[in-house]
């Protein structure tokens, strides 16, 4: 990985999927977005772990998020893990290849009527297995998170409400997470 883009410690954690998930803060994406903005942050990486957990690595804009970022000059790395992703869609263009600069992010629960329609469509079209449908029903509450880039790219995830977050300084030290709005 390019040292200019990825500090060595981050490249190691991404390539070896070795983030310390024992020290996470659990929250919902809606609660996180009530405290921070992802606007102008750099979206470094996305990968999928066993069990269809999605991990996003974001270089969080410290200018927009002074309090959350411990008033650091250097932008810290926010690592998000969505444990149960039931469906995903992504569409990016050539401008998004190097760094994906985030324009906006939003997350909201799917109402039960929309969820039921989505499940029916997923089963009828063969996009959702009966196992996946069963997991969604067992979860009882499902959220849709959309992250868009300034160049028109988009990631959309249908997932269980609880996400896990980690925050690291640019040098790789783990930072505490404060979910109290400034």
Language-model regions: role of each:
Residues 1-182:
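Surface-exposed, interaction-prone regions used to assemble/regulate multi-protein complexes
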């Amino acid at each position: 990985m390019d040292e200019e883009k990825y500090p060595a410690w981050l490249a190691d954690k991404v390539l070896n999927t070795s983030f310390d998930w024992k020290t996470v803060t659990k929250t919902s994406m809606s609660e996180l977005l009530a405290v921070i903005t992802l606007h102008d942050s750099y979206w470094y990486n996305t990968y999928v772990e066993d069990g269809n957990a999605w991990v996003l690595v974001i270089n969080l804009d410290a200018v927009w998020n002074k309090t959350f970022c411990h008033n650091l000059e250097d932008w810290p790395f926010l690592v998000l893990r969505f444990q149960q992703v039931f469906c995903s869609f992504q569409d990016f263009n050539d401008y998004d290849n190097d760094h994906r600069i985030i324009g906006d992010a939003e997350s909201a629960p799917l109402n039960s009527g929309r969820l039921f329609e989505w499940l029916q469509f997923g089963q009828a079209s063969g996009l959702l297995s009966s196992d996946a449908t069963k997991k969604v029903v067992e979860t009882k509450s499902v959220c849709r998170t959309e992250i868009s880039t300034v160049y028109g790219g988009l990631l959309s995830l249908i997932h269980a409400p609880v996400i896990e977050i980690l925050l690291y300084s640019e040098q790789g030290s783990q930072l505490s997470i404060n979910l109290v709005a400034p």
